[in-house]
Amino acid sequence: MDQKQIEEIVRSVMASMGQAAPAPSEAKCATTTCAAPVTSESCALDLGSAEAKAWIGVENPHRADVLTELRRSTVARVCTGRAGPRPRTQALLRFLADHSRSKDTVLKEVPEEWVKAQGLLEVRSEISDKNLYLTRPDMGRRLCAEAVEALKAQCVANPDVQVVISDGLSTDAITVNYEEILPPLMAGLKQAGLKVGTPFFVRYGRVKIEDQIGEILGAKVVILLVGERPGLGQSESLSCYAVYSPRMATTVEADRTCISNIHQGGTPPVEAAAVIVDLAKRMLEQKASGINMTR
C-alpha cells in the first residue's frame, strides 16, 4: 500500500465523520528546529524539551550546517560531542532522563477515572498488580473469571470486528493516542458495513489475550491496540495486533498482522486508523491474517 492509497483511505474515513482530512504528515524529527553548535552546557535546560533534543554538543565543528541538517533528519543521539572518551554532561543527563521516563511509563497505571471517562467497559487479565504483570507474562495472556462473565453479558456476540484496548507496557501510548485513533477507527469500520463489537479496555493484558477474547465473543477479526515497550525518550508508541478467527489452542504469532510505531512522531494515529480499517476488510475478504494473507 503506497502513501497515495493511505491518504485516500484517511480522507474517506474522516469524511464519514464530518471532519476535514489532515494534511500529509511528516515525522516530528523532520521539522525539529536545531540549536546551533554550542560549547557550553546549561544546567537549567529542560532535558525533555525540544531544545534539549535538538542540542548539538560538537565543539568547533568544521561544517556546522552539516551537523544541523543531520540533527534535523533523525531523533537518534547524534552530534552530542565528547569530553575525551566520555559523553558530555548534558548528553549523559538527557540519556538518564529519557531512561527514567521510559521506566516511569512502564510502571504507571491507566487511571480508572480515565477509563470511565471514555465510556469503556474495563476487565482485566489474571494479573492483579503491575509487579506480577512484569514477572508473569503468561498470566497476562488469559482473562480472569470475572472478565469472561462480563464480556459474555455486556458485549456484542459474533461481531465481524472486535476492537480491544490494553495498557501493555506503555500507559502513555493509550492515554495520548486514544482520542485520535479509536473514534476514526470505529467510524471507518461501521462505514465499511461491518458488524463492530463493543470496544473495551483490558488491564494488564498481553498480546495473546486477544485469542481468548475472539473465542469467547465469536469474533471474526480481533484488533488489539496495546502500548509498546517504550524506547529511550519515546514512551507514546502504540501497536495494533490484528488476527483472523483466533483460537487459544491453535493461533500462533505468525497468524497476527502487526502495525507498530503509532504515534505523532511515527505513523499518525488517524492515518493508522484508516490503514487498520483497510486491513480488517482484507482479512475478512481473504479469511486470513499474518503470513497467510496474500498481498
Curated annotation (Swiss-Prot):
Q: Coiled-coil annotation: which residues?
A: none
Q: How is the cofactor bound?
A: Binds between the large and small subunits.
Q: Which InterPro entries match?
A: EutC, EutC_C
Chief location of this protein within or outside the cell: other
- List the EC numbers from the record: 4.3.1.7
The cofactor(s) it depends on are: adenosylcob(III)alamin
Q: Name one GO biological process term.
A: ethanolamine catabolic process
Q: Which GO terms describe its molecular function?
A: cobalamin binding; ethanolamine ammonia-lyase activity
- Report the transmembrane regions from the record: none
Residues noted as binding adenosylcob(III)alamin in the record, renumbered to the chain: 207, 228, 258
Q: Where, per UniProt, does this protein localize? A: Bacterial microcompartment
By sequence similarity, the record places it as follows: Belongs to the EutC family.
Q: Which PANTHER family match?
A: ETHANOLAMINE AMMONIA-LYASE LIGHT CHAIN, ETHANOLAMINE AMMONIA-LYASE SMALL SUBUNIT
Any idea what this protein is called?
Answer: Ethanolamine ammonia-lyase small subunit
Per the UniProt record, the lineage of the source organism begins with: Bacteria, Pseudomonadati, Pseudomonadota, Gammaproteobacteria, Enterobacterales
